[in-house]
Regions:
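Amphipathic alpha-helical dimerization/coiled-coil segments
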Residues: 1-4, 82-114
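Short beta-strand "wing" residues that participate in macromolecule-binding interfaces
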Residues: 61
Length: 114
């Protein structure tokens, strides 16, 4: 039986996957409004996810003031980046194993999650 790596539950949810993917692509940070639009989340849902992720040092939220309205800028922390990339590596391993097992003539070994 082939062992499949465990997936970090912190990221294994559609909203958080979208959030972290967007934040990785915007290393200098992104406004709350732009992040909300990019991830197609409601204000309340995004706010809940961000506060949960900030509590475990995955994201950083800071207020930016200056010309115009103040904005909340969200960025992924170095720890968050490392953890998210580890999650993506584990997910890629699972995808490769499933693709290999699905090929014609593949052995009948079953995949097991840990």
């Amino acid at each position: 039986m082939n062992r499949v790596p465990a997936l970090d539950r912190v990221f294994h949810e559609r909203g958080r996957l979208a959030l972290c993917t967007t934040l990785i692509a915007n290393p200098d940070g992104i406004s709350f409004t732009a992040l909300q639009e990019a991830c197609s989340l409601t204000h309340g849902n995004l706010n809940r996810h961000l506060h949960a992720l900030a509590e475990i040092n995955i994201v950083d939220m800071r207020r930016k003031t200056g010309a115009g309205r103040p904005q909340t800028i969200i960025s992924i922390t170095p720890q968050g980046r490392d953890q998210f990339l580890e999650y993506i590596d584990a997910l890629e391993t699972i995808v490769r194993k499933v693709q290999s097992a699905a090929e014609p003539g593949a052995s009948s070994n079953r995949l097991a999650t840990t």
